[in-house]
């Protein structure tokens, strides 16, 4: 049931001057941002590395991602309940680790989507993905790609390295394939555990309406 006071969560764009409303795992994770083939990467703290990457990216694209925050919470609280980040494929060198890499030359990459367990599977993932789709379409991006997760299929058919990626899915920010497909993405390069999905832009379907988004964000679970 929506809360009587109306929408209690809201989507905020992440752009230059407003990059601090991040999910904690998004703020600390540098899996995508650091090149694993370059020696000396990650010598600073992960938070400093991530902040530097976001600031650099924000000077080149209008929004680098979106977060969902508790609108009724403490105005000074910086942590978001969920965060999605995206960028040109060349700005995510860590993607080389993925078994279905590289990203197509014409595509931007949805690198990560981090979300609190208490608000998973409530449609918030779709709200964030739709926000990225809309912003990317407005920016003239030809296509979006994303590495999806098939956790239930991961087993003896995958390599040890791929198994480590699956085990680290929450830290990396991988999204279940079923959620990505419900947002309009289709498998582009298949894999038992980590396929690469693609969505050509503009999308040939309607995005969530403002009312639908408001209904999905109308209640923030306690705790």
Regions found by a protein language model. Name each.
Residues 89-91, 118, 151, 204:
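Short coil/turn motifs at secondary-structure junctions
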